[in-house]
């Protein structure tokens, strides 16, 4: 019951999920302000997180769309660096584009943040979208999930509950159907 799996099933799409609790785009949960060596972009090329010499073969799977939900862990605790956050989004966009030249890339803001912290990751994502479009890449987007209010319960350590995952999937399904023209 994760929103990526529910979304893929509903859209009859293949999916690959790269996820780990606490991982960030530049700084893992409660990590140093200067970032972590094992944040997702730095280990994205691995088949297994803890094994450096077994690399993922990006040529074997070219998705139509790549959804990126990172940033919550980076800004969930103080201190974090907004400039490093922005640079990490930009650099990860370039990595994704180099691996998946034809895919649409959608940066997601998840359900856990509100206020300034949410605004900081949205600003960073918007900067990537703006820069990409200025350079002619019109296949980069931002989509915001609605905020988790608690009325659907919580999973472990404030992660989304099963019901929140279903809500997130419903939002993403509708968005991707429109974006990808999948009806």
Segments the model singles out, each with a brief description of its role:
Residues 11-16, 62-65, 100-105, 136-141:
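Loop/turn elements at helix/coil->beta-strand transitions in domains of secreted/extracellular proteins
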Residues 1-87, 113-123, 159:
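Conserved SGNH/GDSL esterase-like catalytic core that processes O-acyl groups on lipids
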């Amino acid at each position: 019951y994760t929103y990526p799996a529910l979304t893929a099933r509903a859209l009859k799409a293949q999916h690959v999920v790269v996820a780990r609790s606490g991982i960030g785009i530049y700084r893992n949960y409660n990590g140093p302000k200067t970032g972590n060596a094992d944040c997702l972009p730095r280990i994205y090329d691995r088949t297994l997180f803890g094994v450096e010499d077994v690399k993922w073969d990006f040529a074997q799977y070219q998705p139509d769309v790549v959804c990126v939900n990172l940033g919550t862990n980076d800004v969930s605790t103080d201190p974090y660096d907004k400039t490093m956050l922005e640079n990490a989004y930009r650099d990860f966009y370039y990595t994704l584009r180099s691996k998946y030249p034809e895919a649409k890339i959608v940066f997601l803001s998840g359900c856990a943040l509100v206020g300034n912290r949410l605004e900081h990751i949205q600003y960073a994502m918007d900067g990537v979208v703006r820069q990409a479009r200025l350079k002619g890449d019109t296949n980069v987007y931002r989509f915001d999930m609605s905020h988790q209010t608690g009325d659907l319960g919580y999973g472990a350590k404030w992660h989304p509950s099963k019901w929140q995952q279903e809500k997130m999937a419903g939002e993403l399904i509708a968005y991707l159907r429109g974006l990808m023209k999948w009806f």
